[in-house]
UniProtKB/Swiss-Prot annotation:
The modification N6-acetyllysine is found at K385. Residues 2-191 form the Glutamine amidotransferase type-2 domain. Keywords: Acetylation, Amino-acid biosynthesis, Asparagine biosynthesis, ATP-binding, Glutamine amidotransferase, Ligase, Nucleotide-binding, Phosphoprotein. The lineage of its organism: Eukaryota, Metazoa, Chordata, Craniata, Vertebrata. This is Asparagine synthetase [glutamine-hydrolyzing]. SUPFAM superfamilies: Adenine nucleotide alpha hydrolases-like (SSF52402), N-terminal nucleophile aminohydrolases (Ntn hydrolases) (SSF56235). GO terms for biological process: asparagine biosynthetic process; L-asparagine biosynthetic process. The gene is ASNS. It holds the Pfam family Asn_synthase.
Amino acid sequence: MCGIWALFGSDDCLSVQCLSAMKIAHRGPDAFRFENVNGYTNCCFGFHRLAVVDQLFGMQPIRVKKYPYLWLCYNGEIYNHKKLQHHFEFEYQTKVDGEIILHLYDKGGIEQTVCMLDGVFAFILLDTANKKVFLGRDTYGVRPLFKAMTEDGFLAVCSEAKGLVNLKHSMTPFLKVEPFLPGHYEVLDLKPNGKVASVEMVKHHHCRDEPLHALYDGVEKLFPGFEIETVKSNLRILFDNAVKKRLMTDRRIGCLLSGGLDSSLVAATLLKQLKEAQVQYPLQTFAIGMEDSPDLLAARKVANHIGSEHHEVLFNSEEGIQVLDEVIFSLETYDITTVRASVGMYLISKYIRKNTDSVVIFSGEGSDELTQGYIYFHKAPSPEKAEEESERLLRELYLFDVLRADRTTAAHGLELRVPFLDHRFSSYYLSLPPDMRVPKNGIEKHLLRETFEDSNLIPKEILWRPKEAFSDGITSVKNSWFRILQDYIEHQVDDAAMASAAQKFPINTPKTKEGYYYRQIFENHYPGRADWLPHYWMPRWTNATDPSARTLTHYKAAAKA
């Protein structure tokens, strides 16, 4: 995890513009570099480094002697870089995984390059010989990327929007900033004056398609067919490999552990892989909650079962409320469920950075979208409709769960790794018949649970534990985080404000006082940027007016039991 920033065709003093690059310093606490592009006085790169691989020669922009005309600034991890290096016999100058991008580009161009990358990435590649600029982002947008471009060809790119909003440009007093679409790359012409012109935007990978790099990843051969035992075996192989490839780091590895199915499977598989790799330190797992939190109890059971060095972080309602402003600033969104769920993750990331030496943190993000884990999937009218909804959620991950996971950890200089969003694992899961993936017997993620039924990876009671939303599970069933927030915000936003909400906030007008409160904070930090969020996250096929899972029938029944 790092922070990347670049300008092309700036008409303002670069030393002044560079101040904006410091807005993302949290993403790379180990080092910073600002570098002008030779021959283009109005083009530059900024890079904040979190040293995870090749601590000696890993600074960016990456430049190697063989390609003096190529400049690369990227944020990500390319897990198959060594396999590709050996297969194509590339001569590396560094040990940095991102160097593979330069070699692949020289060999086969930009399209082949992005299709070959197994990992998560956001990059800016400059080719001064052919006068081209390329931008690219991974399939699910696990690594963030924002851009701003004016009609006269000024281009600004950054890992987070906050690094662009204060940039100055003579032609545009208000610079439009927007997220770069996941799963795409863009080709731009570089003009002699340093300005650019967009040539094409290309989708390089759909989540359902088996990626091109599968030809080179070395995973043992999968069994053909959709018999249940065959499918379960293939899923175990792919998930095991998804975790194993993500061990690539020179820093200590830890794991978030909520005690839910997803994080528990990740933690248990991770610990097994660390032992096989003969890593000499114990795996640290981390859980957060208030007193009587069901997550804390469940996480403790999993940690005892797998034998991790477990850390429990307690917080109270006041501490959670106090960080709402910081959280919304970090997130760059006012989406209600994203803000709620981010408080716990923000606080536990802060604890990890301050109290441990774990830097690379594994987590279970992406599973709910991929495996139809949300409670409302029980209401899907058909397996085909459930499949459509699952793919929609995956396409929008970069706006919600992936955004939350990246910003809350990056705010504290941590790097997050998400095995459930592995290309091979996710594309195989999505290739399965729709009726195999839906909830069964009143239990969501039935296929995933059944896959690990006989593995003894995690306790049976955890394997079959019902879905618990992170923002709800960190508090007690009787007094959820949802209810705590409502009680507090009721006194912060009056009825008169709600009555005029549509006039004040015409885009995504808040319908609740909680939504209004978050929107006010967002507008204080990012005025006029409401269009970053196309719509609020809400469950489908239900008349719920709030995204909290606790408001759904499934939970109301559980609370009374």
